[in-house]
Structures are given as structure tokens and as C-alpha cells.
Amino acid sequence: MFWTWLDYRPGMNFDSICQVMNDIGMDGIMLNAPTPDDYRAAIPVAHKHGIEVYAWLWTMNLEHDRDKILKEHPEWFSVNRNGKSLADTTAYVGYYKFLCPALPEVREFIKEKIKAYCEVEGLNGIAIDYHRFVDVVLPTTLWPHYGIVQDREYAAWDYGYHPEMLRLFKEQHGYDPREQEDPSLDVKWRQFRC
């Protein structure tokens, strides 16, 4: 199998792209398109050229619906150990706007989003991406790019401290992980966030 990924934008010459993909022997594409309707437009074109299409969906980190959710539900965003929400701050890059998985509303939002894509006729599959928290430690090769050193887990990049997550953890384990000298070393807290 020979696959690639591609950002789809309405108006692009997707037919010629699929023709080139077919000519070089590509079998499929993980397509990142803004809406289910964009997939409905792209799939027949790709299939005409023998190309399978998987929807490439960002889940915990928002992409196409980021601004809308920031405006309507800022309380849905993940919070770092310093108490800062991604609704109000950034982690590394501006597009890192991860949601908090402890919130039932967030889980329902993601479920409905995936369901909408599952209903797209002809879609061959779905690839889920960014189904996690912000990177707590980046690869060492990226440290100079961001002007940071991450020789341990630092509070500014340690996410998963949304008040609802803290409440649920305390309910299960009887304490607030922030009471630890270094919460990143608390095995129960680490496992809880997995």
C-alpha cells in the first residue's frame, strides 16, 4: 500500500492531484477536509482514480472548528499544571488547542463529529489524530526551535489539570495530585490521565 495525506480545500484541482497519485501508484489518501460535505465532493473524484479515502480527523486538538468552539465553549479546553487553559494560552504553537476528555460534553461532541463522518457515503475509513494531551516533553531536536529545555516535565506543558479531571481523580483516589511535590511523578495521576 502506498498512501499519503493531504489537506483538501474546496476549489482545489483535486482531480489532477488524484490523477498524479494514480500515475505514481498510490492506493489511498488520508484526507483532511473541513466538513463531511467536502468529503462527499472529494470521494467520487478519488475513487474514479482508484484512490481510497480515509477521513483524517483531529479529535482532542481542534482544527476546522477551533474558533467556533473557542467562542462557544472556552470551558471545554485543557488546563495545565499552572492552571492556565488552552482557551486563553498556547502550548508551543497557536493551533494546539486541546480539549479536556473528562467533560461529557467534549466526549459527546467528538462522538457526534465522528458519527457525522461515518455517515459519508463511500468513505473507506477514518484515521483519528491528536487523540491525546499536549506533548509534555518534545523531542530534543525541537528544543532549540522553541527556545526551551525539557529535561523533565514542566508545569507549563503538563496538561490534564482541568477542574473536572481533578475532581474525578480526587473522587477516585482521595487526594488532589497538585498536593504532591512533583505531580508528574505520581503514578496514579499519570495512569488516570491515560
Predicted regions and their residues:
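Aromatic/hydrophobic pocket-lining residues that form the small-molecule binding cavity
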Residues: F14, Y39, V106, I110
